Amino acid sequence: MGTQTLEVPVRSEASVSPAPPDLNAIPALTERVRIGTLGWIGPGFVLVGRSVLIIAAQAITAGVLWLQSHSWSWNAAAKWWTVYGTLADVGCLALMAGYTRKEGIRLRDLIGRVRLHWGRDVFLGIGMFLLVFPFFILGAASATRIVYGSGQPPSFAGLADARVLPLWGIIYSFSLWWLIWSPTEEMTYRGYAFPRFEVLCRNRGLAIGLVSFWWTLQHVFLPFILDWKLVLWRFLAFLPGVVILLLPSLKIRRLGPFVFAHWPMDVVGVFMTLKL
């Protein structure tokens, strides 16, 4: 009886498809700065523009309410922030789409790979949430002491907290607002602005400071209530958590874990501010 040889197929190196290039990585961004497709205008407009768009969305809401009641009230629009915030998201996505197109990339390239095998990004996001969320709580407590001189946080019932919305507004706030808001916010500051300022400034510390400032300031404007103490309180309350949450971007460039960390924060925010 002749012997039979068992042949094991060997994968050719040529058959293994290489990983797609990271078009949002520092080397790729540096090259686009060199050839002139990336400059200061895009990152600057997007970084500042999100706050401007949030204020504009509140102004539009105030205008709609004025048409309904014939009584102008900026603060009356404030309680709708988990509804009109999506208008700012749409504007922000449009801005980023325009500027990324000039760079020759897509919006999707800002997100990077999403690793869901064995729930990798989900669990990493949960870990980040548990690590960072206490800094927002400590920030709020410290800001209350600094601004108001007591342990009692400010109350703007019906505006920033204890908000009363119709049923459809409540459903939208709990179902769609946070699903859109969190990834758009992450794309704006972490996916688009931060790596570009890191390259343009040639200084990580400066890039962190610049993006952290505007990312924190965004929370002052959602909603924007004309009270200087509240403005200062909200800025100081969010600053520590924003800085801590931005630092992992020095190592982790993918947005997946951060979106999974951000979603529960925004859901908690809806629960804490809506009167059910």
Predicted segments with their positions:
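Residues in flexible loops and secondary-structure boundaries
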Residues: 55, 118-124, 130, 195, ...
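Transmembrane helix-loop-helix hairpins at the membrane interface
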Residues: 134-137, 155-158, 163-276
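Residue-level signature of transmembrane alpha-helical entry/exit and packing/kink sites
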Residues: 39-46, 77-85, 89, 120-125, ...
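N-terminal, membrane-interfacial amphipathic/helix-forming hydrophobic leader that caps
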Residues: 1-120, 141, 145, 267-276
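Juxtamembrane helix-loop-helix connectors linking adjacent transmembrane helices
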Residues: 66-82, 105-181
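Juxtamembrane transmembrane-helix termini
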Residues: 102, 147, 225-228
